[in-house]
Each structure stands twice: as C-alpha cells, then as structure tokens.
Amino acid sequence: MIEADRLISAGTTLPEDVADRAIRPKLLEEYVGQPQVRSQMEIFIKAAKLRGDALDHLLIFGPPGLGKTTLANIVANEMGVNLRTTSGPVLEKAGDLAAMLTNLEPHDVLFIDEIHRLSPVVEEVLYPAMEDYQLDIMIGEGPAARSIKIDLPPFTLIGATTRAGSLTSPLRDRFGIVQRLEFYQVPDLQYIVSRSARFMGLEMSDDGALEVARRARGTPRIANRLLRRVRDFAEVKHDGTISADIAAQALDMLNVDAEGFDYMDRKLLLAVIDKFFGGPVGLDNLAAAIGEERETIEDVLEPYLIQQGFLQRTPRGRMATTRAWNHFGITPPEMP
C-alpha cells in the first residue's frame, strides 16, 4: 500500500480535495486554530499596510494538510493584492521564475509550494529578487554573454514546505517572517468540520462533528475528507443526518479507529507487539514482516505514530510504547 491509497494520508491531495477551496477561510478573522500564527500575522499585515509596504517574505512550514496554501491566500486577501501560485518542481529553469517575477505588480504575493525542491540554478535567481527586488539575467552565450539587471516591483514571496531542514541557509535567511503550523487541537477541528458541514448543506450534530474531529489526526485536510465519506454513509444507510453514532459507524467501516489509525498503522504496531514482543526490531526486519518498503515505513507510517507516542525509534530499533499495548487491550510485559 502506498501513501496515495490511504484515506488518512495528508501528504496526498485527492481530486475531491480541490472542492475544499470553496470552504476555506478567506480572511484572518475566519481562520481557526494556530492562535500564535494568527495573532502575529495580523500585526505584520496591519503594519505593512500602514506603511504602504509589501509584506516581508514569509516562510510557512509544517506537516502536510495543515493549511499552508490557505494561509498564503489569506495573506493576499488581507493585503488586497494578487496571488500568483507555483511550486518548486515546476520551476525547472531560471527563465521560468524570471517570467513569473516580471509579471508581478507592486506588493503582489508569489506563492511557491514545496520550495525545498527548487533547483540550485533557480534558487540563485531568487536571492537578488528577494533581497534587492532585482533580477539578474544573462543575455547571449560565450564571449558575447552579458548580464543585465531588471528592477522588480516590491513583492512578497511566500514559501511553503514540509521539510524546513532541507532549505539552504542562504534561502532560509532571506525570509523575514517564519511561521510553523502545528497539528490542530480537537475543538478547533470540530469547529472546522461543523463549518464545512454547513457549507455542504449537511445536518450534523455537534457530537457528530466531534467524532470526525477526533479521528482526523489533527489535520483539517483529513477532517474534510472523512466528513465527505461520513456524508456518503449517512445518505445511503440513513436519512442523511450525521450524529455521533452514525459518524462512528461510518469511520469504523472505513477502518479509521478512535486514534485516527488505519489498517496499515495497526498492522505495523501489531507486528512490533506480536512478532517482536514489543521490540526493539530493526527496520529491515519490520519491513519484511509487514510487506512494505523501508522508505514507506520511515516516511509515511512512522511519523504520526512517533508523534503521538505509540512508537519509539531507538538506536537498537523500533519499540512499541505502553500506549500502543494499551490501545490494543494487550498487557505490556513487565520491565526487567
């Protein structure tokens, strides 16, 4: 099973996730969760507007599905400017970036998703553009080649990444504002689910929204995805109204348990517990035991389990925590 096959994967965007754009918040006052980010951005945006300046360059990082693109849209809306969107892998040549930069109007926002995947050649072009609002372009080839400078209007670059550590220091240092998005708390996710249900014209109880929020792994993208599947279940099996019981039935049918774990999460944890007595177990042995690639375990399955305290990564291998044993109703062995 690959990440794209998993309903609870925030790292992949399904076609239906595009429909979420209609229900995304447009302004900071509509933005739920991330209180520190929201309060800071409100000050930075107001200050920039009072001075009549472009907002300083902004780097947004954090796990996938937490709203980095949404925040970029909110910044552009609050500043009253255009938003130009692209991504690191798309900008293959320096000319690709130059074309976007020269089409910007004063104070516009250029949003680059997956900015950690910019090629070194493109990144070099970005440095003077960010620092001096200038574009250095080479004209011609060989001995006749010459460099010309093009002045750019003041603009805001917003970079988004799930891997802030992969950014080069020169690029990271050019961002005046750096914001980290954290996993959402259940009450905030409950509000997001209820809001989405209203936009979708669904009749949903507060307890129903809470049940979806609890299993959404702290991620709005997953919450909205689960909501659509619960809606399908409620419309086919019941009268369309979503209560806590109906939401629980739907999510149980989808193999998403109370912790937001799916079949693959449980398979990994049970392999560590049952086949390796709780660990430690080496990555290669674990991969063979569950029939997955070691890269899939490291990049897709492990992070959330470790973050939630169900799995430990130790020098001797992976170990199931007491919380993992308790999750399956199994008594952990006595510690020597």
From Swiss-Prot:
Q: Which Gene Ontology terms describe the biological processes this protein takes part in?
A: recombinational repair; response to UV; SOS response
Give the induction annotation.
Part of the ruvA-ruvB operon. Expression of the ruv region is induced by damage to DNA and is regulated by LexA as part of the SOS response. RuvA and RuvB are also involved in mutagenesis induced by UV and X irradiation and by some chemicals. Induced by hydroxyurea.
| Cofactors required | Mg(2+)
Q: How is its activity regulated?
A: The ATPase activity is inhibited by the ADP product.
Q: Quick one: where's region Head domain (RuvB-H)?
A: 258-336
The cofactor remark states: Branch migration by the RuvA-RuvB complex requires Mg(2+).
**Alphabetical list of SMART domains matching this protein:** AAA (SM00382)
Which GO terms of the molecular function aspect are on file? ATP binding; ATP hydrolysis activity; DNA helicase activity; four-way junction DNA binding; four-way junction helicase activity
Q: Which residues bind Mg(2+)?
A: T69
Keywords of the record: ATP-binding, Cytoplasm, DNA damage, DNA recombination, DNA repair, DNA-binding, Hydrolase, Nucleotide-binding, SOS response
> What's the short name of a Pfam family annotated to this entry?
RuvB_N
Listed PANTHER family = HOLLIDAY JUNCTION BRANCH MIGRATION COMPLEX SUBUNIT RUVB, PTHR42848
What domain notes does the record hold? Answer: Has 3 domains, the large (RuvB-L) and small ATPase (RuvB-S) domains and the C-terminal head (RuvB-H) domain. The head domain binds DNA, while the ATPase domains jointly bind ATP, ADP or are empty depending on the state of the subunit in the translocation cycle. During a single DNA translocation step the structure of each domain remains the same, but their relative positions change.
Q: Which family does it belong to?
A: Belongs to the RuvB family.
- Protein name, as recorded: Holliday junction branch migration complex subunit RuvB
Q: What gene is behind this protein?
A: ruvB
